């Protein structure tokens, strides 16, 4: 992929690594690939968002885990209200800590399961969570009319 990134992710990666040392959000072996495998990969949606971003106000990341792709998208697109959903409290707490440390005002964390969410979203993302058929089952009812579901696979 070839696209321009407008955000300096240096502070984010530092804060993430501090949280990771405590909570093991990604394996220690994965830390050396944080930029390539997690941050840059999360921004793979960038070309799509640039085409449709005037129409995008809300984005839900189902099964956000360590905050990918939710946090990089929130940092790169301050005009989009990003919701990071995960059922595991320690992961949500870590993302909340990152949010506070970096003052990410357009990021909301939700500790719950997708089937319990009632709000509708313009875009739903999911990365490394479940099989595509299960993801479609959870995502479809949460999409606004003419919304988009983007599965990172």
Regions found by a protein language model. Give the residues of each.
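S-adenosylmethionine
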Residues: 79-83, 87-153
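Glycine-rich phosphate-binding loop signature in dinucleotide/nucleotide-binding domains
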Residues: 52-55, 117-119
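Conserved SAM-binding loop of SAM-dependent methyltransferases across substrates and taxa
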Residues: 66-79
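Conserved S-adenosyl-L-methionine
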Residues: 61-65
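Conserved catalytic-site loops of classical short-chain dehydrogenases/reductases
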Residues: 58-59, 123
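Amphipathic, non-transmembrane alpha-helical secondary structure
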Residues: 43, 47, 71, 133-137
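Class I SAM-dependent transferase core
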Residues: 1-54, 60, 90-105
């Amino acid at each position: 992929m070839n696209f321009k990134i407008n955000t300096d992710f240096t502070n984010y990666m530092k804060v993430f690594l501090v949280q990771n040392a405590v909570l093991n959000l990604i394996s220690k072996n994965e830390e050396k690939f944080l930029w390539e495998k997690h941050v840059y990969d999360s921004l793979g949606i960038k070309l799509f968002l640039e085409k449709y971003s005037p129409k995008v106000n809300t984005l839900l990341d189902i099964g956000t885990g360590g905050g990918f792709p939710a946090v990089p998208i929130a940092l790169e697109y301050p005009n989009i209200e990003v919701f990071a959903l995960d059922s595991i409290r320690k992961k949500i707490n870590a993302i909340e800590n990152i949010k506070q440390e970096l003052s990410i005002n357009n990021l909301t964390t939700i500790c719950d399961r997708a089937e319990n969410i009632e709000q509708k979203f313009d875009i739903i993302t999911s990365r490394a969570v479940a099989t595509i058929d299960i993801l479609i089952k959870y995502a479809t009812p949460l999409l606004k009319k003419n919304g988009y579901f983007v599965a990172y696979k």
